Amino acid sequence: MLPFILFSTLLPLIFTESEQQLWFCNSSDATFSYSYCDSMKFPFSITAEPCITLKGTNGFLHIKFIPRRDLKKLYFNLSINVNSIEVPTRKEIICHGYDDNYSFCKALKGETVNTVVPFSFKGILFPKGQYRCVAEAIVGDNEEKLFCLNFTIIHHPNVN
């Protein structure tokens, strides 16, 4: 009986594929990577210029993908975990369907979205540790999942 219990317990661990971490960038105080957090993997490219430092940088994120749905209404569910402490999930509306700030909000299914989004961390102090952010993109009136990405940030500030 014991071999059966051990086999049934270890079998899922043997055949479970570990999620591949895709490198984002490596700066002087942080390492950024992401992986897919659902089974709907599709080509998605994200790069930062310059690579993000959490001690106060600003720059641009270059994002490129081909949506599987029209982007008339788009929002993100953002779940953040800081050093194993859960922060309440935040819903961030990106495209309302009218009077939108981003040009890609009118993109149709199958059109390539190639956009640049500014970022800034000036004035924000991040404690040392590991940050995880799950960004789940939801589109349309039927609220269909467009994609889900799991970002990992390891912050290792230099102590001088």
From Swiss-Prot:
Sugar attachment sites: 26, 77, 101, 150
Any Gene Ontology CC annotation: extracellular region
UniProt modification remark: N-glycosylated.
Disulfide bonds: 25-51, 37-148, 95-105
Keyword Transcription regulation attributed: no
Main location: secreted
SMART domains from the UniProt entry: ML
Domain of life the protein comes from: Eukaryota
Signal peptide interval: 1-16
GO biological process assignments: cellular response to lipopolysaccharide; detection of lipopolysaccharide; inflammatory response; innate immune response; lipopolysaccharide-mediated signaling pathway; positive regulation of lipopolysaccharide-mediated signaling pathway; positive regulation of tumor necrosis factor production; toll-like receptor 4 signaling pathway
Annotated GO MF terms: lipopolysaccharide binding; lipopolysaccharide immune receptor activity; Toll-like receptor 4 binding
Keyword terms of this UniProt record: Disulfide bond, Glycoprotein, Immunity, Inflammatory response, Innate immunity, Secreted, Signal
Classification via InterPro entries: Ig_E-set, LY96, ML_dom
Chain spans, region Interaction with lipopolysaccharide: 119-123
Subcellular location: Secreted, Extracellular space; Secreted
Pfam families: E1_DerP2_DerF2
PANTHER family: LYMPHOCYTE ANTIGEN 96, MD-1, MD-2 - RELATED
Function: Binds bacterial lipopolysaccharide (LPS). Cooperates with TLR4 in the innate immune response to bacterial lipopolysaccharide (LPS), and with TLR2 in the response to cell wall components from Gram-positive and Gram-negative bacteria. Enhances TLR4-dependent activation of NF-kappa-B. Cells expressing both LY96 and TLR4, but not TLR4 alone, respond to LPS.
The protein's assembly and partners: Heterogeneous homomer formed from homodimers; disulfide-linked. Belongs to the lipopolysaccharide (LPS) receptor, a multi-protein complex containing at least CD14, LY96 and TLR4. Binds to the extracellular domains of TLR2 and TLR4. Ligand binding induces interaction with TLR4 and oligomerization of the complex.
Protein name: Lymphocyte antigen 96
Organism whose genome encodes this protein: Cricetulus griseus (Chinese hamster)
This protein's encoding gene: LY96
